[in-house]
């Protein structure tokens, strides 16, 4: 048991050190759906939208909106990086292969899928630690049908939740410009039109 504690401590310190030492998003490497290491420096000069996704969520239909954006702007240097996450209501079950098949069949998704990650907590991806440090929580849209529901749910769990940068739910998105700056964060209640408006200023 003592050995496990030491291993956990070392891993935690390593993740913290990696995040602290990172000067740019291009300093990070991640695993893709085939468990191959991908350096985000491969995306230099591209505009990126990084999103944590789930296949059994009320926001899952956003896959279609994301694919529409991807098809519209990929030729202008736009990329979407899809990171499945099972932390919110266990709404991303199954293997990455199963997730990829689901997205392909139901939404004709062509943008790149990566390995499952955690976005909050002790085992969170260093990439998402970095993203959250650059763009905090933006607030749920009260005009969205799920906005008030999510707000009330979060307040019950933590009355001070809105002041924290943690990812609140599936389909939180981070927009990164061609120089690697994390310029915008979109909550799951933000519409595709809002994302597109910001995206067009960067292309």
Regions found by a protein language model. Give the residues of each.
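Conserved helix-turn-beta segment immediately C-terminal to the redox Cys motif
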Residues: 46-47, 55-56, 60-84, 103-107
């Amino acid at each position: 048991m003592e050995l496990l504690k030491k291993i956990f401590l070392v891993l935690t310190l390593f993740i913290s050190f990696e995040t602290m030492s990172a000067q740019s998003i291009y300093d990070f490497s991640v695993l893709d759906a085939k468990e191959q290491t991908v350096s985000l420096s491969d995306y230099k000069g591209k505009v990126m939208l990084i999103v944590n996704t789930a296949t059994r969520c009320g926001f899952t239909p956003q896959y279609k909106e994301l694919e529409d954006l991807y098809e519209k702007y990929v030729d202008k240097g736009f990329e979407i990086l899809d990171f499945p996450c099972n932390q919110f209501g266990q709404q991303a079950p199954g293997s990455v292969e199963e997730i990829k098949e689901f997205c392909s069949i139901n939404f004709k998704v062509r943008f790149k899928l990566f390995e499952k990650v955690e976005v909050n907590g002790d085992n969170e991806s260093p990439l998402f630690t970095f993203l959250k440090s650059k763009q905090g929580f933006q607030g749920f849209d009260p005009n969205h049908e799920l906005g008030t529901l999510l707000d009330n749910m979060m307040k019950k769990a933590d009355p001070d939740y809105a002041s924290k940068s943690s990812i609140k739910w599936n389909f939180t998105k981070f927009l990164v410009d061609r120089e690697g700056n994390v310029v915008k964060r979109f909550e799951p209640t933000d519409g595709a039109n809002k994302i597109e408006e910001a995206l067009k200023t960067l292309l």
